[in-house]
């Protein structure tokens, strides 16, 4: 096996991408369809599980069992208003499991529930397989990216998804920081530059300001919205056309999942068209109750429908500039990342905000994040290529971290935009006389009161010797590692008694046992997928062999060289097999193979006799002419629009 390499995975809301750094450069790896990005979708059918393009391609036929947007659920509570709002747009069911959201689907005739981590792990497994196919050997080490504005629970849940997928997650890094590496890697030696990364993807939005100076990438500030992206623009278009259909045809199909799914696919296509044309047309045959829906939309109308969303991208830009204590004139480069930055209006708003400055479009907005992640993966594996060995990444914590003190006040130990890894210690004391213990409640957020912030976890430090209030000294240490994941320790200085928490037993987190179980299930699903692939392979082989034999004996050129009795024998047996195939499309692999042997026993003696008689070499495996006919023989294709 080759020396161990590590891959970089951009796990996106709508699309994911994987890269590897080898021989001094990054390769973005194409999937089996030849695409360099893969849809972050997983579909469950009566017979199999599909991931990526295969899942997205059948979504109109199977909307309620095709899961996407797991990134909008991961690390969130079921009661989160964001989750509740999103559920209105999703065709699949999300259920409440102890305030953790769970996706419910029908798979192989059974109702199954999956946590967002499991769905994301399936996408990660797919990306891992794409890389393994390209490299030709197993891969286990990976760097996975997350939005810079992801909080602790979202980061931890993403890391868990990697573990379930059988990956050793070397590091979780921020998407804009990864993109900055892609941008700055070949631009060394130009002196210090302040770079603003504007990353607007399918579901999340980040702004990061970095200083790049001779291989040192230092993040100065980060801001964003973990719930803004291309999907939200699609939603506006969908709502617009649902209303238009109501006006024109007096019918409402907003509850018909298949119709809405077909409309959404058309809207996504129209949105992309509007980045290069000023008008796009939608043509959907028999959208609802047999009515064809032919309509069009102009770029101006699209911009008007999304104007508030587009404008809202500038608030994080202002916030990041304030936090970095920079004036907009001090930014040297404005770098666009994420597919949604192709929208002309988004570019214009950013350009106008920076007084007409040119935007830098030199990196591929879809691939930059995976590119940077692949570089970081190589560095963590100790790659000594000259262009990466001196590279240093200094990232920041996106949100302030602290604990609750008397009266529900948030006391921050680590301020937002502190460079990580970092460690801060502070002394606290008791609030009442002879208090036997203290409850340490850890929060993240920017508000003054803890009730407005996000509770990450809590633990008790007990056994404090009786003493008047204010006497005991409790030393609390917050320690953030390079993944942006927090450890908190509390020590009673008088007794040396300590207690610690890695914020992993946050209520939304999966326990070690659950992760173990999911790892085993992931293996099981993978094995089932393999069996299904082999089954289909055996079925197709039998089918093409039967049609092949049929066409060989019916060949006009063989007239007179084969007796009618033999010809009838072969044709009857072929017909019998083809009829059996039609009736048994779900048979097992060995049944298909057994049928093939039966057929070969009839055909082989006749066919080989034929070729010996003709003096020609045997036909070997015959170049199967693909004569797929009849129902059940060969795939039945339906246009998905």
Swiss-Prot record:
Domain of life from the UniProt record: Eukaryota
PROSITE patterns, per database record: HSP70_1, HSP70_2, HSP70_3
Gene3D superfamilies per UniProt: 1.20.1270.10, 3.30.30.30, 3.30.420.40, Actin, Chain A, domain 4, Substrate Binding Domain Of DNAk, Chain A, domain 1
GO molecular function annotation: ATP binding; ATP hydrolysis activity; ATP-dependent protein folding chaperone; heat shock protein binding; protein folding chaperone; transcription corepressor activity
The record's account of how the chain is modified after translation: In response to cellular stress, acetylated at Lys-77 by NA110 and then gradually deacetylated by HDAC4 at later stages. Acetylation enhances its chaperone activity and also determines whether it will function as a chaperone for protein refolding or degradation by controlling its binding to co-chaperones HOPX and STUB1. The acetylated form and the non-acetylated form bind to HOPX and STUB1 respectively. Acetylation also protects cells against various types of cellular stress.
Region (Nucleotide-binding domain (NBD)): 2-386
Residues modified as N6,N6-dimethyllysine: 561
Modified residues (Phosphothreonine): 636
Single GO BP term: regulation of mitotic spindle assembly
Region described as Disordered: spans on this chain: 614-641
Annotated GO CC locations: centrosome; cytoplasm; cytosol; extracellular region; nucleus; plasma membrane
Protein family according to the UniProt entry: Belongs to the heat shock protein 70 family.
Name used for this protein in its record: Heat shock 70 kDa protein 1A
Organism: Sus scrofa
